[in-house]
Each structure stands twice: as C-alpha cells, then as structure tokens.
Amino acid sequence: MKNLALSSMQPKPGHFYAVGIGPGSPDLLTLRAASLVENCDTVISPQAKGSAKSIALEAVRPFLKDQEVIVHNYPMQRNRAKTQQRWQELADDVARRCDAGESVVQVTLGDPLIFATSSYLMQGLSEKLPAGHIHVVPGISAFQTTASRFGEALTLQEDRLMLMSATDISAVEQALEQCETLVLYKAGGCIEQLMELLRRRDLLQSASLVSCGEQGEHELQLADLSQWRVEPLGYMTTMIIRIGSRPWLEE
C-alpha cells in the first residue's frame, strides 16, 4: 500500500484508522491516538486467543465514550489460506461500516506497521475503501520500550540496527554477523535456544530483555541475560543484543 492519507486529530466518516497505542500504558498514547479513539464511532481491539481480556482495549479504556467496541480474536496460525480468509472476513466487516459512514479505529499495541495485526487488516482493506480513506497513526514500539528500561543507545554513528522475529534461530545467528545491535521480537517462546546461542557466542552479558513492558506487575526486566533463571516468558518478550560498534568515519 502506498500514499496513505495523512491523519488528523478528528476521525472522518467512512475512514479507517490503524492506531498504534504503544506498549500498553494509557499515558503512552500519543495525543492523536487518544483523540481518534475518543471521537470515533467504532473501536476494534485485538485479543489474544485464550486471554481473559484485551490488553489493547484496557490501555484505551480511559478514552472511550459511548462508541461501539468490538473485540476480535485475530488469526495467529501458520495456515496461510485460513488466515487470509479470516482477515478478509474482518476487512469486509470494516468496509461495510465505513460504507455506512462510520469512522472505525483499530487499536494495536506498539506500532501498526511492526509485527502488528493492523498490517494484515489494511491489506484486506486496500481494495475495499476509496483512496485516502486508510490512515496510520504511529505508536511507541516494544523495542523502544525495552531500550528505555536500560538507558543505553541502540545505535550511534555508523552502527547498524536490525529488528527481526526470534523464531528462526539460524536466521538470528546469521544476523549477529550483520549488525551492531540486534532486536528480537517474540523471544519468549524460544528463550532457551536463544540463551544457548548467546552462551556459545559469549554474548549473554551483552543481551537484555523486557517481557510484557508497561503492563504493571506482569512486566519482567533483565539487564544481563547471564543472570537469567529459567522461568516462563510471555509472547510479548523483546530482547536487545549489543554486539559491538563500528569505527567512526573520520573526515
């Protein structure tokens, strides 16, 4: 999708807004995100399968008025055909609402364009809504939240920053050779394999992680993975590995 419309503070009838709401704390929404949630007709929020509540919905609850609120269990399976079919059904519903003149906001944790459900929904809407009726509002991402916990720069001067999913360990090992700072999303489900890789590469002390950042008592921080003790980690676990730094380019 190209040439998306610029978004304003006030939602327009018949328009769709993919709104990043940050890591899950209401005070980390941008002013634009809060205003769109507060003034739209319909709010759509994701909820992980098996979860008792939607983290994204709880984060925007202080800004809700009398909008219709829809909570969806979005498809997270690896069956491409079934996943695409479900996203198409969701896109059809949003398109019907927009055709009826509703302003629709889909809230998503983090940023709508980084490992986010919004990206799938926007793909389905791209041929259903008129040009200029799809908007993206950026949000604070998980890797920014994780970095803020430890106060160390992610990249300086010529350093290369790479962001990827942690689920393919062989790809992670290759990435360690291609950047100075590596950010891994979805690290909780493969933490033991990651620990073994980092141990073998002597990088445990150079790696840190945050699980469930900005989610109150559920948050776990670890500044040095050599101190990690085996315990379950959530899906929303982000790891930062600082591999080194590149020499400055002198004039």
Place the predicted regions along the sequence by residue.
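Glycine-rich, flexible N-terminal cofactor/catalytic loop recognition
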Residues: L4-H72, L176-Q178, E196, S208-L209, ...
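A contiguous loop/helix-start segment that scaffolds small-molecule binding in enzyme catalytic cores
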Residues: F16, L176-E251
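Gly/Ser/Thr-rich loops at beta-strand to alpha-helix junctions
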Residues: S25-P26, G50-S51, L109-T117, I140-A142, ...
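Short acidic active-site motifs
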Residues: R32, D93, S170-V172
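General beta-strand structural signal in soluble alpha/beta enzymes
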Residues: S45, V71, Q106-T108, V136-G139, ...
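Glycine/small-residue-rich loop that forms an oxyanion/phosphate-binding "nest" at active or ligand-binding sites
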Residues: V71, P75-E102, Q106
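Conserved Motif II region of HX4D acyltransferases
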Residues: C98-L121
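Class I SAM-dependent methyltransferase SAM-binding "motif I" and its flanking Rossmann-like core
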Residues: I114-Q178, R229-V230, I243-P247
